[in-house]
């Protein structure tokens, strides 16, 4: 195909947004939010895809979205970003810049998503390609969700799974202990910090 000039030119545009420097932990809430996604299968073969935003300090899942038998779209990610800002600040724009760390998935790197993030005062930041450990906070949550919730739940179909996710996230935020939070749940930790 190359001999007949049938190949597309290489993409040469430089993507705005810096690569992640490898440091995930921060010293207070709302400095860095990490985002990632996962998928799991129901017993009937239907597939659920879930994306979430987690605070790198207090570990609370601030917002999430899930779909059945489809991919997470840029629109889903943008809605999730807005929901996170609204939940944390009761406004449509964060009062200060927040680093939004994600992988290089197309829903996150899309131009519309990056511009929308900037309008919310979120600074898009991307992990190096093929380096999931650079977003360890998100990867740890994925492992916890699969081990402590998905694996032990009856998931006959997508409709059942989608109904259960809200309860899993609520349990994780309110009850699930974290060693990094001195065995408190994310919300217990947040409440203790605000006293």
Curated annotation (Swiss-Prot):
The cross-references to PROSITE patterns, in alphabetical order and at most eight, read:
INTEGRASE (PS50994)
Alphabetical UniProt keywords = Transposable element
Q: Name one GO biological process term.
A: DNA integration
In alphabetical order, the GO MF annotations are: nucleic acid binding
Pfam families linked to this entry:
rve
Q: Which InterPro entries match?
A: Integrase_cat-core, RNaseH-like_sf, RNaseH_sf, Transposase_IS3/IS150/IS904
Could you tell me which residue ranges the Integrase catalytic domain spans? 25-194
Q: PANTHER family recorded for this chain?
A: TRANSPOSASE INSF FOR INSERTION SEQUENCE IS3B-RELATED, TRANSPOSASE INSO FOR INSERTION SEQUENCE ELEMENT IS911B-RELATED
- Stated name of the protein: Insertion element IS136 uncharacterized protein Atu4601
Give the species this sequence originates from: Agrobacterium fabrum (strain C58 / ATCC 33970)
